[in-house]
A protein has these predicted regions:
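Short S/T/G/P-rich N-terminal loop/turn motif that feeds into the first structured element of a domain
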Residues: 1-81, 90-96, 108-192, 202-209, ...
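Extended hydrophobic/aromatic segments used for targeting, binding, or gating
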Residues: 205, 211-228
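A common structural junction motif
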Residues: 101-108, 214-215
Length: 243
């Protein structure tokens, strides 16, 4: 159960987790052909917060919107949303799906849901002051999913968007990238990306050899674009599609 006193706007955490404790993590992607405005209004709404804040076994939850096109547009993609969660174990996750009425309503109103179970093995940085990824794991051969998240400083917003547009285009055409989408909690300011790669090596080939990407990394550090950053690599344990 997540203590209410730790709720800070869109943050639902945190308790002390023993180092030996192993959590389960999921990324749910929801797609809408109808009910788009209903889902958009749910973003950051008190109704959603109240529905999930005291659910047993829940350690972390974020409901994220997405940007149109490649995800870096200031115009939202009203047809696509992402939810990231961590649980004490899969039994609590199953109970949430079976019993949480608001989550069930989201499923019913959506046209498709993709459930990805992940195993984080490399992570650095924080999300609202805390890193929710606690497992001690290692890379397994196969596809990986990468999450990057940053809070952009207000006085760096224009520079950020001008510079990142070229990188977004380059990653979409990069060999080894199966999927890429810009997501976020707060339009423009709190930015994140989710990408799926055929292997860890294919991700590294892009990250460490693509000139556009390297240029942006250097510029971000030099100009101090971000007040907070998080980078996570995860094994993909399973991926299921529900319609």
């Amino acid at each position: 159960m997540v203590p209410q006193k730790t709720l800070l706007s869109r943050v639902f955490l945190y308790i002390t987790i023993p180092k030996s404790f192993y959590l389960t993590y999921y990324i749910d992607q929801f797609y809408f052909k109808k009910n788009k405005i209903w889902m958009f209004k749910l973003m950051g709404a008190y109704t959603f917060n109240k529905s999930v804040i005291n659910f047993d076994g829940l350690k972390f939850i974020k409901l994220l919107g997405t940007g149109s096109k490649d995800g870096f547009s200031v115009i939202p993609d009203f047809s696509s949303y992402v939810m990231i969660t961590s649980w004490e174990n899969d039994d609590f996750r199953k109970k949430f799906i079976d019993e949480n009425k608001l989550f069930q309503e989201i499923i019913i109103k959506s046209s498709k849901r993709i459930e990805i179970k992940i195993d984080p093995y490399n992570y650095i940085g924080t999300w609202n002051g805390v890193n929710p990824f606690k497992n001690k794991s290692s890379y397994k051969e196969g596809k990986i999913i990468v999450l990057t998240r940053a809070r952009v400083r207000l006085n760096k917003l224009i520079n950020f968007f001008i510079s990142t547009s070229s990188a977004a285009k380059s990653i979409n055409s990069r060999k080894g990238a199966d999927y890429y989408k810009g997501v976020g909690e707060l339009p423009i300011i709190e930015q994140a990306t989710i990408s799926i790669w055929k292997s860890e090596q294919s991700m590294k080939d892009y990250a460490y050899s693509n000139k556009s990407h390297l240029k942006i990394i250097h510029k971000a550090r030099k100009d101090k674009w971000y007040s907070e950053e998080l980078f996570v690599r995860s094994n993909i344990i399973s991926s299921k599609e529900f319609k």
